[in-house]
Amino acid sequence: GIALTVDGAEFRTYARQVLDQASLLEERYKNAKPRKQLCSVSTQHYMFAVEAFVEMIESTKSDEYEFTIRETRTKDIINQVANMLSEIGIIYLSDFNKDVIGKLLREKHLEFHPLFRAPLHVFISRDNPLAGKKKVTMDDLKPFPFIQYEQGEEGSFFFAEEAVWPEYSPKQINVTDRATILNF
């Protein structure tokens, strides 16, 4: 009879694995139906991002999809995109933070593409005494609490979502989610 050498037996083992994998590939793609549409977005706490996300879902024509939106801290957004947990990250970039955030993006091999330039704005209730004013100054805001998004232990002013900071605010509230703000 015939006997395989050690090398021959090893070759046969690898050849079987290759043939099995080829068979799995053929089975997978032979009668393939369209795959589930996937999309993950990590964003700072912006209403426009949520509205765009909802619009994207509503315009999806796929029968199967899995979409994820994560409202989170700036550094987490960058890490989630770098680690491919999200395809897109939405962050605020300004003259103040562009050097620090730009450096971090380069280190993570990520690119920043501006969506738009937004003027500064203040969110206030229609019952707020400032609601009727066309323009609001920092002095106008002094009697009110300054609400800011918490950026965690590693957070710094450079990762903040707020565009301006009061010189001094005796009333300060730190939040982690946008919904909490609606209660103030």
Please provide the spans of the model-predicted regions:
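Basic, amphipathic "hinge/linker" alpha-helix immediately C-terminal to the N-terminal HTH DNA-binding motif
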Residues: G1-Q21
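Short beta-strand-centered segments that line the small-molecule binding cleft or hinge
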Residues: V54-S59, K75-L120, I124
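Secondary-structure junction motif
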Residues: A49-E55, K98, L130, K134, ...
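Hydrophobic hinge/microswitch elements
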Residues: R73, A82-E87, Y92, Q151-F184
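Flexible hinge/capping segments at coil-to-helix
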Residues: K33, L104-L120, I124-F146
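Short, well-ordered beta-strand segments
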Residues: L38-Q44, G89, F123, I147
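Hydrophobic residues within well-ordered alpha-helices
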Residues: T5-G8, V81-A82, L141, N183-F184
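N-terminal winged-helix
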Residues: R16-D20, L24-E27, A32-Q80
